[in-house]
Each structure stands twice: as C-alpha cells, then as structure tokens.
Regions:
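Positively charged n-region of N-terminal signal peptides that target proteins for export
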Residues: 1-4
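Bacterial Sec-pathway N-terminal export signals of envelope proteins
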Residues: 21-80, 251-254, 258-299, 347-348, ...
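Periplasmic alpha-helical coiled-coil/stalk elements that build and connect Gram-negative outer-membrane
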Residues: 29, 53-55, 164-282, 386-389, ...
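Sec/SRP-type N-terminal targeting helices
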Residues: 42-46, 59-60, 126, 142-170, ...
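Acidic, low-complexity, intrinsically disordered peripheral segments
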Residues: 67, 74-93, 258, 441-466
C-alpha cells in the first residue's frame, strides 16, 4: 500500500512539474509566431522580391544598351600570292598641260606604245597569326510603340499585386490562427465545465451514500448518481483529448514541435456590433485591390499587344579596333573605325494577325472587368453574411448567459427541494445536467463570437495582423 501511495505521489509530482514548465501562449504571441513560420507567407514575400527585381529590369530598358566585344584568336593560316608583271605606258605632257600617252596610231586604228616601263612580277606572303578585335556599341531606343513604358507599368502593377497578396496571406494566417487558438480555448474550458460537473456529482454521491446509511435513500439512488459520474468522466476524457489535439494543431500552425508543452489563456471578449466599422466600399480589401490591378493589367496588355505592330526607331553608335596579321612582313591590321546609324522597323500586317491579336487582348480585358464586377458583388455578399453571423453570435451569447443564470438558479432551488425531500433525486440530477449543458453552450458561444468577429474584420478589410 505504501509503495502504491509513493508511486501515485511521484506521478502527481511529475505532472505538476510538466504543467509548471508548460509555455503559456497568448493569442497575439501565437499570431506573431504563425506569421514568422507560415510558408505561404514566406513564399508571398519572395514573390514580392521577384516582382520588384522584374520592375527594375524593365525600367532599365529606358536607358541605352551598351555592349562590349573582344575577340582574340591565333591562326596558323598563311599563304602567298603574286601580282603579275607587265608593260606600263609612259605619258608625256602636251602644250596644254595635259598628260597624253606616248603612242603611235596604226592603220587599223590600234595603238603601239612608243615608250613603256617594264613592271616586274611581285610575290607577297601573308600570315594571320594573332588577331585581336575589340568594339563598343551603344543602342538607344527612341520609339518602340509604347512597349517599354507599358511593360514598366505592368511590372509596377505586379509589385502592387504582390504587396496586396502579402496582406491577403497575412489575414488568412491570422484567421487560421484564431480558429486554432479558440478551438484549444474551447476544449480547455469544456474540460473545466466537465470537472465542475463532476465535482457536483461527487458531492451529491457523498450525500446520497450518507442518506443510504441512515436508511433515507435506496441503492438505486446511488446507482443513478454513479451513472452520471461515469458520463462526466467520459466528458472529461473527451475534453482532455480534444484539448491535446487542439494544442498539437496550434503548435503545427505556429511552427512549434507537435509535442511542445503549451497552454492557452482566455482572450478578451469581442467588441459590440455597434463599435464595428461599416465599410462603405470593398476597396480596402486586398482581394479587391488585386482584382483591380488584374483588370488594369489586362488593359495594359492591350497596349502591349498593339505595340508589337507599331514602328520601332533606335539610334546606335559603335567603335571598333582591329590589330594583327602580316602581309609582306608588315602589320596588316592596326586601326580603328567609328560608325553611327539609325534603325527603323515597320511591321506590315498583310493577313490580319496583329488586328486579331489586339482584339483577343481586348476580349480578355472585358472578361477581367466582368470577373471583377462579379467578385466585388461576392465580397459585398460575404461581408453582409459575416455581419449577420456576428449579430447572431452575439444574440446566442446573450441567450446562453441568461440560460446559464437560469440553470444555476434552478439547480440551487432543486437542491434545496431535494434536501428537504420535496423533489426526487432524478429531478435534481436533471437540473445538474442542464446546468452543465448550458455552461458548455456558453463556452461554445463565446468562441463562436470571437471567430465571427475575426471573419467580419477580414470581410471588411480591417483585420490587423498586429
């Protein structure tokens, strides 16, 4: 017997130690951890970095493009060529100061050189050896049909959409964390309600057993109380299991190991409906901003598509230097050259390809406009539904509070009636069970009100992540 008592004492001490070292987390702390850990949010932030880099790259298209080229190669190619020799006429200066050939006209009209110089054949060798070519070129677009400016504007829209996507993801993380946190709070408080109910039954059982010993009650009364005790034990076990699973789910969301020892605390009550913001429009919601930018992106795409079939004008300049090679023992290449030019490109649409592509882009823009209108109406409907659910949750909470007060008073009166013998045990047990049910309903109503409040804030675009 002493060994059993020692073992129970050791187990209780270990459980107390675990509870003492359990980390107590508030709702704000869980939201902060979830925002740091959430992979979807990290991906959204990386998407913002990507779109920012894209925007900067498109902005660079406004500036001149500068290219450097350097080529150095060695070749063993070599060869020799000969310039054939011949007779070169000799010119004389006449009285008018003009050069005339020194020739004799033959009878057949042909010419015979009176004097000439003999030009011998010339042989020259060449080698490529090492040749270096270097150049620098500058190209500045003057007009590209609006493609450069349109692409830049579209990249800025992409950055804005990425920023709003971060807001949207943050709000989704906050809502998800609220749901997980209040699921744990609900399970914890349901366990407390079940334990309170069990305490009432334990006290009642002692009284019934005492009355049985004095012959004032039957064994059947004891069995009735024991049945309720068993039901209470099962409710406690279910609540504890639900609480552990809810804590594991919360740890998963906030990035802690599933086996972490954590506890949750009761959060503040949700504000009254009269203090809630009533949005005039859905423009503050990130979903609306994303849709608006998506529609504008489709409009800009019409301009971008049209720019492919407009004239393109660019001006360019370059300088090149060449060095290397040998011809007749002397350097062949050793000079530089500069050039300046204008490029004009004018696409010609002979078969309607450009026209149809522009029409297709316009159709996509109209589709985006209709989708935006439809989703705007859906968001307004979502807000109205969230507002109704919040009002209903407040009404349910108020009714549950009243019902619990009535159940507590009914249980008190029933206890008095039972103790003086004016009410059977079954009726008293029924009032206790009713009190336990009203307490559980109140816990559920409080948690549902908090979740309805968060959903309403998200639907109105006023949900803060801080």
């Amino acid at each position: 017997m002493k060994k059993i008592l020692s073992l129970l004492l050791l187990v209780n001490c270990q459980l107390s130690t675990v509870n003492c070292f359990a980390q107590t987390l508030t709702l704000d702390e869980c939201i902060g951890k979830a925002l740091e850990y959430n992979k979807s949010l990290s991906s959204a932030k990386m998407k913002l970095d990507q779109t920012t880099f894209d925007m900067k790259s498109y902005k660079a298209n406004f500036y001149p493009q500068i290219n450097l080229l350097a080529l150095d190669f060695y070749s063993t190619a070599r060869g020799e060529f000969t310039i054939e020799g011949g007779h070169l006429p000799i010119y004389s200066l006449d009285a008018s100061g003009k050069y005339v050939p020194n020739v004799t006209v033959n009878d057949d009209g042909s010419y015979t050189l009176n004097q000439y110089a003999d030009f011998p054949s010339q042989s020259m060798k060449w080698k490529l050896k090492n040749i270096f070519v270097g150049s620098v070129s500058v190209m500045e677009p003057l007009y590209a049909g609006g493609k450069i400016s349109t692409a830049y504007e579209m990249s800025k829209l992409g950055v804005n959409m990425a920023q709003e996507n971060i807001r949207l993801t943050e709000s989704e993380v906050v809502v998800k964390t609220h749901e997980a946190y209040y699921l744990a709070v609900k399970a914890k408080e349901l366990g407390e309600v079940a334990r309170s109910y069990k305490t009432l039954l334990d006290e009642l059982k002692k009284n019934v057993e005492g009355a049985f010993r004095h012959g004032m009650s039957t064994r059947n009364d004891i069995m009735k109380v024991q049945v309720k005790q068993n039901e209470a034990e099962l409710s406690i076990q279910k609540a504890d299991n639900g609480y552990q699973l809810a804590l594991m789910n919360l740890c998963h969301i906030i990035g802690l190991p599933l086996t972490s020892e954590v506890e949750v605390v009761k959060a503040e009550d949700a504000p009254a409906a009269s203090s809630l913001p009533v949005p005039v429009e859905m423009g503050v919601r990130p979903e609306h901003v994303i849709l608006d930018n998506k529609t504008e992106l489709a409009r800009q795409n019409v301009k971008l598509t049209r720019s492919d079939y407009l004239p393109n004008v660019a001006v360019g300049a370059s300088y090149a230097y060449s060095h290397g090679g040998e011809l007749a023992g002397k350097k062949l290449l050793n000079n530089g050259s500069a050039s300046l030019g204008v490029v004009v490109k004018m696409p010609i649409d002979l078969f309607g390809g450009s026209t149809n592509k522009v029409r297709s882009a316009k159709a996509a823009y109209q589709i985006a406009q209709m989708e935006q209108q439809d989703l705007d109406e859906q968001m307004q409907l979502e807000w109205a539904q969230s507002k109704n659910l919040y009002d209903e949750a407040q009404t349910e909470l108020r009714l549950c509070q009243t019902a619990l007060e009535q159940a507590a008073e009914n249980m008190r009166l029933s206890k008095q009636q039972y103790e003086v013998g004016f009410e059977p045990l079954a009726d008293y047990l029924e009032t206790q069970a009713h009190w336990q049910q009203c307490s559980a309903n109140l816990v559920n109503a409080r948690c549902q009100l908090q979740l309805a409040y968060v959903q309403l804030m998200k639907a109105s675009g006023t949900l803060s992540v801080h």
